[in-house]
Protein backbone atom coordinates (compact mmCIF):
# COMPACT_ATOMS: atom_id res chain seq x y z
CA UNK A 1 0.00 0.00 0.00
CA UNK A 2 1.21 3.51 -0.79
CA UNK A 3 1.76 5.92 2.08
CA UNK A 4 -1.51 7.86 2.60
CA UNK A 5 0.38 10.88 3.97
CA UNK A 6 1.40 11.70 0.38
CA UNK A 7 -2.20 12.72 -0.47
CA UNK A 8 -2.34 16.09 1.33
CA UNK A 9 0.93 17.45 -0.14
CA UNK A 10 -0.09 16.23 -3.60
CA UNK A 11 -3.48 17.96 -3.36
CA UNK A 12 -1.76 21.13 -2.08
CA UNK A 13 0.49 21.08 -5.17
CA UNK A 14 -2.61 20.74 -7.35
CA UNK A 15 -4.30 23.63 -5.55
CA UNK A 16 -1.30 25.96 -6.03
CA UNK A 17 -0.91 25.07 -9.71
CA UNK A 18 -4.62 25.36 -10.52
CA UNK A 19 -5.04 28.64 -8.57
CA UNK A 20 -2.39 30.12 -10.85
CA UNK A 21 -4.65 29.43 -13.85
CA UNK A 22 -8.20 29.75 -12.46
CA UNK A 23 -9.67 30.41 -15.91
CA UNK A 24 -9.13 26.71 -16.71
CA UNK A 25 -11.67 24.06 -15.76
CA UNK A 26 -10.26 21.13 -13.81
CA UNK A 27 -10.73 18.74 -16.78
CA UNK A 28 -8.85 21.19 -19.02
CA UNK A 29 -6.08 21.45 -16.43
CA UNK A 30 -5.82 17.65 -16.32
CA UNK A 31 -5.70 17.57 -20.14
CA UNK A 32 -2.77 20.01 -20.02
CA UNK A 33 -1.03 17.68 -17.57
CA UNK A 34 -1.69 14.76 -19.94
CA UNK A 35 -0.01 16.73 -22.73
CA UNK A 36 3.05 16.87 -20.47
CA UNK A 37 3.02 13.08 -20.05
CA UNK A 38 1.14 12.95 -16.76
CA UNK A 39 -1.47 10.21 -17.15
CA UNK A 40 -2.47 6.81 -15.80
CA UNK A 41 1.11 5.54 -15.66
CA UNK A 42 2.63 8.59 -13.95
CA UNK A 43 3.85 8.39 -10.38
CA UNK A 44 2.77 10.79 -7.66
CA UNK A 45 6.29 12.23 -7.67
CA UNK A 46 6.09 12.93 -11.42
CA UNK A 47 2.69 14.58 -10.96
CA UNK A 48 3.94 16.78 -8.11
CA UNK A 49 7.04 17.77 -10.11
CA UNK A 50 4.88 18.86 -13.07
CA UNK A 51 2.43 20.69 -10.81
CA UNK A 52 5.33 22.56 -9.19
CA UNK A 53 6.68 23.44 -12.65
CA UNK A 54 3.24 24.76 -13.66
CA UNK A 55 3.00 26.80 -10.44
CA UNK A 56 6.47 28.20 -11.11
CA UNK A 57 5.34 29.60 -14.47
CA UNK A 58 1.79 30.61 -13.39
CA UNK A 59 1.90 31.04 -9.59
CA UNK A 60 -1.18 31.65 -7.45
CA UNK A 61 0.52 34.75 -5.97
CA UNK A 62 3.10 37.15 -7.38
CA UNK A 63 6.37 36.30 -5.57
CA UNK A 64 7.22 39.34 -3.45
CA UNK A 65 9.81 40.11 -0.78
CA UNK A 66 9.23 43.28 1.18
CA UNK A 67 6.65 44.44 -1.37
CA UNK A 68 9.00 44.07 -4.34
CA UNK A 69 9.40 41.37 -6.98
CA UNK A 70 11.57 38.70 -5.37
CA UNK A 71 13.29 37.54 -8.57
CA UNK A 72 12.88 37.58 -12.32
CA UNK A 73 10.49 39.44 -14.57
CA UNK A 74 6.75 38.83 -14.55
CA UNK A 75 3.93 39.56 -16.97
CA UNK A 76 0.75 40.57 -15.18
CA UNK A 77 -2.46 40.64 -17.21
CA UNK A 78 -5.23 42.68 -15.63
CA UNK A 79 -8.83 43.33 -16.63
CA UNK A 80 -11.35 46.09 -15.99
CA UNK A 81 -9.60 47.96 -17.59
CA UNK A 82 -7.21 45.90 -19.71
CA UNK A 83 -3.50 46.22 -18.85
CA UNK A 84 -0.36 44.26 -19.71
CA UNK A 85 2.19 45.01 -17.00
CA UNK A 86 5.75 43.80 -16.78
CA UNK A 87 7.07 43.83 -13.21
CA UNK A 88 10.77 43.59 -12.37
CA UNK A 89 12.52 43.97 -9.01
CA UNK A 90 12.97 47.71 -9.70
CA UNK A 91 10.55 48.90 -12.42
CA UNK A 92 7.02 48.60 -13.76
CA UNK A 93 6.22 48.74 -17.48
CA UNK A 94 2.54 49.45 -18.17
CA UNK A 95 0.97 48.83 -21.58
CA UNK A 96 -2.63 49.60 -22.48
CA UNK A 97 -4.39 49.32 -25.82
CA UNK A 98 -3.84 52.34 -28.09
CA UNK A 99 -1.36 54.10 -25.76
CA UNK A 100 2.39 54.37 -25.41
CA UNK A 101 4.04 52.13 -22.79
CA UNK A 102 5.04 53.81 -19.54
CA UNK A 103 8.02 52.80 -17.37
CA UNK A 104 8.56 53.91 -13.79
CA UNK A 105 10.29 52.87 -10.59
CA UNK A 106 8.09 51.61 -7.78
CA UNK A 107 8.23 51.37 -4.01
CA UNK A 108 5.98 48.36 -3.42
CA UNK A 109 3.36 46.01 -4.82
CA UNK A 110 0.49 44.70 -2.71
CA UNK A 111 0.20 40.90 -2.56
CA UNK A 112 -1.74 39.82 -5.64
CA UNK A 113 -2.63 36.93 -7.89
CA UNK A 114 -5.38 35.88 -10.30
CA UNK A 115 -8.76 37.20 -9.18
CA UNK A 116 -7.19 39.79 -6.88
CA UNK A 117 -6.72 43.56 -7.35
CA UNK A 118 -3.35 44.81 -8.60
CA UNK A 119 -2.10 47.89 -6.73
CA UNK A 120 1.37 49.43 -6.98
CA UNK A 121 2.82 52.27 -4.88
CA UNK A 122 5.26 54.44 -6.84
CA UNK A 123 8.41 56.03 -5.41
CA UNK A 124 6.48 59.25 -4.65
CA UNK A 125 3.95 57.38 -2.51
CA UNK A 126 1.02 57.38 -4.96
CA UNK A 127 -0.97 54.17 -5.31
CA UNK A 128 -1.90 53.05 -8.82
CA UNK A 129 -4.75 50.56 -9.24
CA UNK A 130 -4.69 48.35 -12.32
CA UNK A 131 -7.91 46.37 -12.11
CA UNK A 132 -8.15 42.67 -11.33
CA UNK A 133 -5.35 40.24 -12.21
CA UNK A 134 -6.40 37.61 -14.72
CA UNK A 135 -3.00 35.94 -15.16
CA UNK A 136 0.58 35.91 -13.88
CA UNK A 137 3.38 34.51 -16.01
CA UNK A 138 7.08 34.29 -15.30
CA UNK A 139 9.13 35.79 -18.16
CA UNK A 140 12.61 35.14 -16.76
PLM region spans:
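Actinobacteria-biased recognition of intrinsically disordered, low-complexity terminal regions
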Residues: 1-6, 140
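Short, charged early-sequence alpha-helical segments and their helix-coil boundaries
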Residues: 36-66
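Structural motif
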Residues: 18-25
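Amphipathic alpha-helical segments that form the core helices of the histone-fold
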Residues: 15, 29-42
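N-terminal non-globular leader segments, chiefly Sec-dependent signal peptides
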Residues: 4, 23, 32, 123-126, ...
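Basic helix-extension-helix modules of the SAP/HeH family
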Residues: 4-13, 38-40
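N-terminal accessory interaction module
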Residues: 64-140
Amino acid sequence: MDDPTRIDPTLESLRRAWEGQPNLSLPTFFAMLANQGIGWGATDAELVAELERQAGVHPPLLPLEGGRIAAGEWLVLADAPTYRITATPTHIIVRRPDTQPVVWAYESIRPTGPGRPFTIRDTEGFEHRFGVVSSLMRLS
